[in-house]
């Protein structure tokens, strides 16, 4: 499995690789980090699976764009290669990185991402605002996004939940509901087992 560690900012890519390898050892999967590759796109073309870790989405997108990985990964996904991404890794699977929660600490070439799905993901979705916080809630920020991007669906994916897309069918896995946003549609929630075909 090819691992993309480029969302790491305060620790090294090698440290991230080791951390991820330790977890995947439990299920017998060998991890190869793309930062060691002389030809990153070739590594993607030869990958049996692709895993993109969390961290800072802007740092991740910038490095992926510099190495031409967005299109290479999309091509592999279309061929049936499994893709796993958490946090920033889920953001880059979307058409854009515009619904990340991260600070723009570096400037990528654009906000465009892999586009493996047609909707936007907001990972770590929270309902509550911290006590004493006078800024926008997560929901308010997403409502701003759909105001500017009225054709796009956004899903608020809560902690401990994931989306599994296989053979043209998608399911929510986890014990918490997922919040759904779209311009002109009253915000609603879906649970594990609900039909998500409207997002595809």
Per-region residue spans from a language model:
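N-terminal beta1-alpha1 cap of cysteine-dependent amidohydrolase-like domains
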Residues: 1-53, 187-193, 200
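C-terminal and late-domain segments of enzyme folds
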Residues: 3, 11-15, 99, 103-200
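Short, active-site-adjacent cap segments at secondary-structure transitions
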Residues: 10, 57-58, 90-93, 162-164
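Charged helix-capping and loop-helix junction motifs
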Residues: 18-19, 65-71, 105, 136-138
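General beta-strand structural signal in soluble alpha/beta enzymes
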Residues: 32-34, 52, 84-86, 155-156
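Catalytic-core regions built around general acid/base machinery
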Residues: 46, 66-80
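Catalytic nucleophile loop
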Residues: 51-54, 77-96
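Glycine/threonine-rich flexible loop motifs
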Residues: 57-67, 131
């Amino acid at each position: 499995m090819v691992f993309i560690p480029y969302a790491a900012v305060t620790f090294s890519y090698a440290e991230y690789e080791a951390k991820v390898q330790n977890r995947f050892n439990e299920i017998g999967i060998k991890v190869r980090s793309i930062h060691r590759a002389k030809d990153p796109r070739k590594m993607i073309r030869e990958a049996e699976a692709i895993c993109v870790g969390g961290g800072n989405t802007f740092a991740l997108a910038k490095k992926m764009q510099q190495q031409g990985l967005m299109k290479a990964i999309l091509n592999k996904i279309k061929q049936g290669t499994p893709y796993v991404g958490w946090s920033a890794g889920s953001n880059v699977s979307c058409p854009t990185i515009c619904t990340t929660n991260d600070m723009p600490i570096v400037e990528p070439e654009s906000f465009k991402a892999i586009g493996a799905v047609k909707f936007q993901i907001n990972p770590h979705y929270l309902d509550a605002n911290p006590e004493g916080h006078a800024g926008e809630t997560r929901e308010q920020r997403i409502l701003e996004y759909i105001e500017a991007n009225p054709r796009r669906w956004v899903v608020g994916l809560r902690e401990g939940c994931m989306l599994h897309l296989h053979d043209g069918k998608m399911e929510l896995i986890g014990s918490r509901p997922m919040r759904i946003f779209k311009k002109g549609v009253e915000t609603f929630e879906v649970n594990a087992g609900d039909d998500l075909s409207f997002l595809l």
